[in-house]
C-alpha cells in the first residue's frame, strides 16, 4: 500500500519530522509518505521537511506545515540546537547516541581532545560525564559557534573551541595536551582538506605523542564502503601501542541490514 521507503532517512524531532533522500522522489511518493506518517497513532507533528541531499541548492521542501524554527534535540539531560531547514547537516547526529552515552559513563576525570568537533555534542556529553576539560577543534567557525551555544544552554564549563584546519595544526594541538581521551569523528570526505582513506592514518600516527599512558582513543568511521577492519589495521600499522578494546555501532544498527555500512565507533587504549 505504502511502497518502499528504504532509500529515505526519517528522523523525528517533535513537533517536526525530517525526511532525507539522496535520490529524486516523485510527487505521488511524497503524498504517500505524508499519508503514511499521518496514519501512525500518537505520532504528532506540525511540520514535515524533505531534505534533498542529491541537490546542492534549493534542496529543502516543506511537505506539511511551515519551516521550523528554534528546534532542539533532547537526549539524556541535554538539549542541542537544530537547524531543520538547512540544506546540509542539521547540527546533530542521532546515530551517535551510543557514543555520547559512553562518554557520559567514561569521561570522568579526563582531559579530552575532540577532533572534527562540529557542533560539539560529544564535548557536552563528556563534560556532563565529569571530564576535566574538553578541547574542541574544527575548521568550521559557524559550527563551533553553535557548539559554544550548546555548552552554555546545557550549563557545562571546561570547554575550549579552536578554529583549526586539523591536518595543518598537529603541532599546536599537541602542545595543548597531553590528553587522556581523544575523539576522532571526521566526515568521510571534506573536500581537499580531509578524505578518510587518504588522511585518517595521518592522525593515528600522531596519537602517541599527544596522549598520556593509558589514554583512550574513540575512533569513529561513517563510510558505507569502509568497515571496522580499516581502523583496526591502521592502528596496528601506525600506532601499535594502542590496542583495540571494544566497538559500538549506530544507535539504529538493529534497523540496518549491515551495521558495518553505518557508523562504527571503535575504542583503543594506549598500553
Regions found by a protein language model. Name each.
Residues 4, 9-11, 27-93, 101:
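Non-catalytic substrate-recognition/targeting regions of SAM-dependent transferases
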Residues 94-110:
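Conserved alpha-helix/loop element of class I SAM-dependent methyltransferases that forms part
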Residues 109-118:
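Conserved class I S-adenosyl-L-methionine
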Residues 119-131:
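Conserved SAM-binding loop of SAM-dependent methyltransferases across substrates and taxa
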Residues 133-138:
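Conserved SAM-binding motif I beta-strand of class I
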Residues 139-183:
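S-adenosyl-L-methionine
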Residues 166-169, 173-240:
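S-adenosylmethionine
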Residues 228-271:
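Class I S-adenosyl-L-methionine
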Amino acid at each position: 500500500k505504502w511502497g518502499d521507503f528504504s532509500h529515505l532517512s526519517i528522523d523525528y524531532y517533535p513537533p517536526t519530522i525530517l525526511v532525507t533522500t539522496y535520490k529524486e522522489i516523485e510527487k505521488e511518493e511524497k503524498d504517500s509518505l505524508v499519508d503514511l506518517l499521518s496514519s501512525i497513532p500518537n505520532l504528532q507533528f506540525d511540520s514535515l521537511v524533505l531534505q534533498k541531499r542529491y541537490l546542492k541548492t534549493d534542496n529543502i521542501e516543506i511537505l506539511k506545515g511551515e519551516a521550523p524554527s528554534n528546534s532542539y534535540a533532547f537526549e539524556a539531560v541535554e538539549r542541542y540546537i537544530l537547524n531543520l531547514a538547512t540544506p546540509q547537516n542539521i547540527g546533530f547526529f542521532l546515530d551517535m547516541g551510543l557514543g555520547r552515552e559512553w562518554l557520559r559513563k567514561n569521561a570522568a576525570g579526563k582531559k579530552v581532545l575532540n577532533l572534527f568537533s562540529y557542533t560539539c555534542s560529544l564535548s557536552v556529553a563528556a563534560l556532563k560525564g565529569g571530564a576535566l576539560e574538553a578541547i574542541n577543534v574544527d575548521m568550521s567557525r559557524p559550527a563551533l559557534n553553535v557548539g559554544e551555544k550548546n555548552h552554555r544552554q546545557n550549563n557545562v564549563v571546561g570547554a575550549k573551541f579552536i578554529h583549526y584546519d586539523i591536518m595543518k595544526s598537529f603541532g599546536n594541538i599537541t602542545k595543548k595536551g597531553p590528553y587522556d581521551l581523544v575523539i576522532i569523528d571526521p566526515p568521510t570526505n571534506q573536500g581537499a582538506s580531509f578524505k578518510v582513506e587518504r588522511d585518517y592514518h595521518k592522525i593515528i600516527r600522531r596519537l602517541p605523542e599527544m596522549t598520556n599512558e593509558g589514554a583512550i582513543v574513540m575512533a569513529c568511521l561513517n563510510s558505507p564502503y569502509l568497515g571496522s577492519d580499516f581502523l583496526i589495521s591502521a592502528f596496528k600499522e601506525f600506532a601499535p601501542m594502542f590496542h583495540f578494546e571494544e566497538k559500538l555501532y549506530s544507535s539504529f544498527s538493529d534497523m540496518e541490514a549491515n551495521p558495518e555500512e553505518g557508523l562504527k565507533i571503535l575504542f583503543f587504549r594506549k598500553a
